[in-house]
Design a protein with these regions (language model features):
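A structural signal for short hydrophobic beta-strand segments in well-ordered beta-sheet cores
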Residues: 134-137
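Amphipathic, small/basic residue-rich leader segments at the start of a protein or domain
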Residues: 1-82, 104, 108, 269, ...
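A short core secondary-structure module
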Residues: 142, 146-188
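Glycine-rich beta->alpha junctions and the first turn(s) of the following alpha-helix
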Residues: 186-277, 342
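Internal helix-loop-helix
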Residues: 43-107, 111-112, 154-160, 275, ...
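C-terminal helix-coil-helix/basic helical segment that borders enzyme active sites and/or dimer interfaces
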Residues: 22-28, 276-330
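A short, Trp-centered hydrophobic/proline-enriched beta-strand micro-motif
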Residues: 112-120
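Glycine-rich phosphate/cofactor-binding loops in nucleotide/flavin-utilizing enzymes
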Residues: 63, 67-68, 227, 321-366
């Protein structure tokens, strides 16, 4: 099935199957809606395209997943921030888990039966991921994990966690596990953010026993896994977010009176151009994936462009809708506040620019 056939068939199916969100816009409601949408799309096979048959997929290029995400976002069927983890964690499981484990678990994620989380950042190890201290030690054929993670998205809803631990010194001493979040010794404490949604959490591991067959890859493969995962976190998982931001630009145009100030036209044009640039860059990433390329440091360009475009769009809304953010409780206010983190989550803008300078432009470390 080519992209045109897929998109037209998907649109016909969505037109005939109402998956619109209900009245509950709380985080609980958003997570339940995401599960509902994924389950319906999986049962109708749309969620299975672009994934390998070994994990219940129907094959085809990864761009089909991007098309699906765009349609979900354009119709407002699922909150974009929580939809994104599929494109981060499923490829990681396919690449690093035992084939039997991936075949068992990935359909649970794609089919909306489970939510997963990613346990990377720690209180003292955010951008400096290699300094993480959560420790895993072997004991009686299993591994015992002790430590703390923070900024773990949706941990309070997650059934599983892709977890980085330290098993030896240095980069080669980082090992990844696929951990059941209901295991004894795990405590989850949600964190309230300034936009009023407790989607992040800190997670404590107190002598948590993890079976040896839940290791992802081999001992010491955790750093390589992270380097393979993070490019997805900085590119493919944002395909649908670009479409979501276009809907917000459309809403801004609808709410504005007919512009009579050339400066307004310039601001709107600049916001559109920033989004168009991200979309063009994203299409290039999709083509590289379709050609079998492995994503790498070039995805930092995707992340920088997207973060800049998102903040520019909501800055434009603030400037052209005076008082809407400051004096009223509207979606504009919540999304503006959320956009402030766009240059932080998934690796700060400064880190991304350092990666671009050192690994793409070969400018050295100074």
């Amino acid at each position: 099935m080519n992209v045109t056939e897929f998109r037209s068939g998907l649109r016909r199916w969505l037109d005939g199957n109402d998956l619109s969100p209900g009245p509950d816009h709380s985080l609980d409601g958003q997570v339940a809606q995401l599960a509902r949408v994924r389950r319906a799309l999986y049962e109708a096979d749309w969620m299975r395209y672009g994934w390998p048959a070994e994990v219940g997929g129907l094959g085809g290029p990864a761009v089909l997943r991007a098309v699906l995400g765009e349609e979900v976002a354009t119709r407002g069927l699922a909150e974009p921030g929580i939809y994104s983890m599929i494109e981060v964690l499923a490829p990681t499981m396919i690449s690093y888990a035992r084939p039997e484990l991936a075949a068992e678990m990935v359909p649970l994620l794609l089919g909306g039966r489970e939510q997963w989380c990613q346990g990377f950042s720690e209180p003292g190890s955010g951008s400096d991921l290699a300094s993480l201290t959560t420790r895993a030690v072997p004991r009686d054929g299993d591994w015992v994990v002790t430590g703390q993670k923070v900024w773990t998205s949706l941990a309070q809803y997650a059934a599983r966690c892709v977890l980085l631990t330290r098993t030896a010194p240095g980069h080669d001493g980082i090992t990844a596990f696929f951990v059941d979040m209901d295991a004894p010794g795990i405590t989850v404490r949600p964190l309230r953010t300034m936009h009023g949604v407790d989607e992040f959490a800190e997670v404590f591991f107190d002598d948590v026993v993890v079976p040896a067959d839940r290791m992802l890859g081999r001992p010491g493969d955790g750093w390589r896994l992270a380097m393979d995962l993070l490019p997805h976190e900085r590119s493919t998982c944002f395909w649908h977010r670009v479409a979501h931001l276009y809907t917000r630009l459309d809403r801004l145009l609808t709410e504005l009176a007919e512009p009579d100030d050339p400066g307004e036209d310039l601001a709107l044009g600049a916001a559109y151009l920033a989004l168009h640039t991200v979309r063009c860059r994203s299409h290039g990433t999709q083509r590289r994936l379709a050609a079998g390329a492995r994503l790498g440091p070039e995805t930092s360009v995707d992340k920088v462009l997207l973060a800049g475009a998102e903040q520019q769009l909501f800055d434009t809304a603030r400037d052209l809708l005076p008082g809407v953010l400051e004096l009223t409780d509207t979606p504009w206010r919540e999304e503006y506040l959320y956009s402030r983190a766009a240059t932080i989550y998934g690796g700060t803008a400064e880190i991304q620019r350092n990666i671009i300078a050192r690994r793409l432009l070969d400018l050295g470390r100074d």
